[in-house]
Each structure stands twice: as structure tokens, then as C-alpha cells.
Amino acid sequence: MRIAKVRGTVVSTYKEPSLQGVKFLVVQFLDEAGQALQEYEVAADMVGAGVDEWVLISRGSQARHVRDCQERPVDAAVIAIIDTVNVENRSVYDKREHS
């Protein structure tokens, strides 16, 4: 799993039928200090995340184990909206401070 920040949405009128009703987000991965990396991915949103929220991403075959992703061609899924991140006893992110 990786930490990312939601940067935007992807809208698709025509898609694989099993993806009907799935919301897609553009996410940018973050390093251990919370700094943005130049690495982006489109992920299926399973939790109702919004732009600028920090999220947890499940990727690869593990993404297909997420409920509602089974039997769907999904390589990345947003599986959690992050409240706090602490690294080495230091707060990197607190959602309450970014609301």
C-alpha cells in the first residue's frame, strides 16, 4: 500500500461494463515526509474520497481483493481516507489541520 493525495477525477462516458458506477481519481504519491512525488496513478475510489484528501492506495493484484473490485479490471484502489500520519514519532499529516 502507498500514501497518496487526491489531485483530481477522471470521467469516462464509455467504459468496461463491470466498471459502471465506479468513480475514478487521479492520485499523486507522497514520500515519507509527505512531499509530493512526480508519480501519478488513476485509482478506483472505494471510499468516497475528495480532491486534496490524503488516501491509502492498494495496488496490483491486492487491489482486486478489495470488496467491490473483485471481477473488475482494477490495478489501483483507494481503500481509506487518512486521518493522521506519524513517522518516527513526528506528525507528518493531520487531517484536522488541513480541513
Curated annotation (Swiss-Prot):
CDD domains per UniProt: EutN_CcmL
Keyword RNA-binding attributed: no
Keyword terms of this UniProt record: Bacterial microcompartment, Carbon dioxide fixation, Carboxysome, Photosynthesis
GO biological process: carbon fixation; photosynthesis
Biotechnological applications listed in the UniProt record: Heterologous expression of 12 carboxysomal genes in E.coli (ccaA, ccmK2, ccmK3, ccmK4, ccmL, ccmM, ccmN, ccmO, ccmP, rbcL, rbcS, rbcX) leads to the formation of bodies that resemble carboxysomes, have densely packed paracrystalline arrays and RuBisCO activity. These structures open the door to generating carboxysomes in plant cells to increase their photosynthesis and productivity, as well as tailoring bacterial microcompartments to specific metabolic needs and molecule delivery.
One Gene Ontology CC term in the entry: carboxysome
Subcellular location: Carboxysome
Record's keyword annotation contains ATP-binding: no
Molecular function GO terms recorded: structural constituent of carboxysome shell
Occurrences of domain BMV (ranges): 1-83
PROSITE patterns: BMV
Upregulation: Carboxysome size and components vary with growth conditions. When grown in ambient air at medium light (50 uE meter(-2) second(-1)) there are 7.4 units of this protein per carboxysome, the numbers are stable under low light, and increase under high light and high CO(2) (at protein level).
Disruption outcome: An insertion in this gene leads to rod-shaped carboxysomes and an inability to grow in normal air, called a high-CO(2) requiring phenotype, HCR. When ccmL-ccmM-ccmN-ccmO are deleted no carboxysomes form, cells are HCR and RuBisCO is soluble. Both mutants grow on 2% CO(2).
Domain of life: Bacteria
One Pfam family, short name: EutN_CcmL
Quaternary structure and partners: Homopentamer. Interacts with full-length CcmM.
Annotated family: Belongs to the CcmL/EutN family. CcmL subfamily.
Notes on the domains: The tight homopentamer forms a pore with an opening of about 5 Angstroms in diameter which opens into a wider tunnel at the base of the truncated pyramid. The pore is positively charged.
Function: Probably forms vertices in the carboxysome, a polyhedral inclusion where RuBisCO (ribulose bisphosphate carboxylase, rbcL-rbcS) is sequestered. Has been modeled to induce curvature upon insertion into an otherwise flat hexagonal molecular layer of CcmK subunits. Beta-carboxysome assembly initiates when soluble RuBisCO is condensed into a liquid matrix in a pre-carboxysome by the RbcS-like domains of probably both CcmM58 and CcmM35. CcmN interacts with the N-terminus of CcmM58, and then recruits the CcmK2 major shell protein via CcmN's encapsulation peptide. Shell formation requires CcmK proteins and CcmO. CcmL caps the otherwise elongated carboxysome. Once fully encapsulated carboxysomes are formed, they migrate within the cell probably via interactions with the cytoskeleton.
Name of the featured protein: Carboxysome shell vertex protein CcmL
